[in-house]
């Protein structure tokens, strides 16, 4: 992960992003993008810095900078980001992720989750129905999102979708590889289909119409909260439902995205459950629900995690 801090003489803003190898990103390449942007530059206007950040492509580097700018603006204006954007921080049902394994192991894993309302199940093209049947039998009161991670072919989708619907699957995420989505044109799926790897910014939406019914918004794909807000607004106007997704990161990485939860039909921001140590003022997850954002973590007029920022040594 990357943590970025942007400061003036009195205030600072911070944010976290997670470079993703699927998009040819790494901590090294993203850090180089950020350093190159600021090399031998000083700024006298916030707008000047914002314009420079927007010259970066959508991705993890821009995400960290954009969200740090929002946090800084909250401190400078003494107005929380939620207030600036007219958003409400809410408690939301959050999907818990179930990783690929044998049917028996996945069944045992979902049993240990204690009947969560929503489970995201990672499924490749092997044993699709056998795995899903074992999981559904162990959690008969749960609903499921199946994430194929681009691994299926159209025949896999066509042959399994009816059986998956009977197993309480309510959404299928990125069944086909990005770029092969044209096979979904005129396919009437009994389960809504969600674009993940095929959806990065609002510019992708016209292509996705007629292929998907839901778009997965991840700030590391959009390049920050600014574009995520635009994408969510335009997507809803075009008739798409919203899913909020994330990479594996701490609560700081989830914080900006959580402000869009009230617009989302599906929330999948469980990244902090997969890290060894979370932030001091972190989200809590209980009974399948994710707590509202604590503005003392990010996006508030004050930030009680200043002790962490003071320790950062930016090279």
From Swiss-Prot:
Name used for this protein in its record: N-acetyl-D-glutamate racemase
InterPro entries: DgoD-like, Dipeptide_epimerase, Enolase-like_C_sf, Enolase-like_N, Enolase_C-like, Mandel_Rmase/mucon_lact_enz_CS, Mandelate_racemase_C, Mandelate_racemase_N_dom
Induction: Expression is up-regulated in the presence of D-glutamate. Transcriptionally regulated by DgcR.
Catalytic reaction(s) noted: N-acetyl-D-glutamate = N-acetyl-L-glutamate
CDD domains in the record: L-Ala-DL-Glu_epimerase
Family in the record: Belongs to the mandelate racemase/muconate lactonizing enzyme family.
Biological function: Racemase involved in a deamination-independent D-glutamate degradation pathway, named the DgcN-DgcA pathway. Catalyzes the conversion of N-acetyl-D-glutamate to N-acetyl-L-glutamate. Also shows racemase activity towards the dipeptide L-Ala-D-Glu, a key constituent of peptidoglycan muropeptides, suggesting that it may also contribute to the degradation of peptidoglycans.
Cofactor(s), by name: Mg(2+)
Pathway(s) where this gene product acts: Amino-acid degradation
Gene from which the chain derives: dgcA
Pfam families: MR_MLE_C, MR_MLE_N
Binding site for Mg(2+): 147, 173, 196
Keywords: Isomerase, Magnesium, Metal-binding
EC number: 5.1.1.25
Outcome of gene disruption: The growth of the deletion mutant is significantly reduced with D-glutamate as the sole nitrogen source.
Cofactor note: Binds 1 Mg(2+) ion per subunit.
């Amino acid at each position: 992960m990357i943590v970025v801090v942007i400061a003036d003489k009195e205030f600072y803003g911070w944010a976290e992003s997670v470079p993703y190898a699927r998009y040819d990103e790494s901590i090294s390449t993203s850090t180089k993008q950020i350093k190159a942007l600021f090399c031998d530059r000083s700024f006298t206007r916030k707008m000047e810095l914002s314009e420079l950040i927007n010259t970066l492509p959508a991705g993890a580097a821009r995400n960290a900078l954009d969200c740090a700018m929002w946090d800084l603006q909250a401190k400078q204006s003494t107005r929380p980001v939620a207030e600036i954007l007219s958003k409400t921080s809410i408690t939301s049902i959050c999907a818990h992720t179930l990783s690929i394994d044998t049917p028996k192991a996945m069944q045992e894993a979902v049993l240990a989750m204690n009947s969560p309302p929503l489970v995201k199940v990672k499924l490749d093209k092997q044993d699709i129905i056998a795995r899903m049947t074992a999981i559904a039998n162990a959690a008969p009161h749960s609903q499921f999102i199946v994430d194929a991670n681009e691994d299926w072919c159209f025949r896999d989708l066509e042959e399994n979708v009816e059986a998956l619907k009977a197993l309480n699957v309510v959404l299928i995420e990125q069944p086909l590889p990005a770029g092969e989505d044209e096979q979904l044109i005129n396919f009437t799926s009994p389960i809504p289909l969600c674009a993940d790897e095929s959806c990065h910014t609002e510019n992708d939406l016209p292509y996705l119409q007629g292929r998907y019914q839901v778009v997965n918004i991840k700030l590391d794909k959009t390049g920050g909260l600014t574009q995520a807000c635009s994408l969510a607004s335009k997507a809803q106007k075009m008739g798409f439902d919203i899913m909020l997704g994330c990479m594996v990161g701490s609560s700081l990485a989830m914080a900006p995205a959580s402000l869009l939860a009230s617009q989302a039909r599906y929330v999948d921001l469980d990244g902090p459950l997969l890290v060894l140590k979370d932030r001091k003022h972190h989200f809590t997850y209980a009974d399948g629900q994710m707590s509202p954002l604590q503005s003392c973590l990010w996006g508030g007029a004050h930030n009680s995690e200043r002790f962490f920022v003071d320790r950062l040594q930016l090279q």
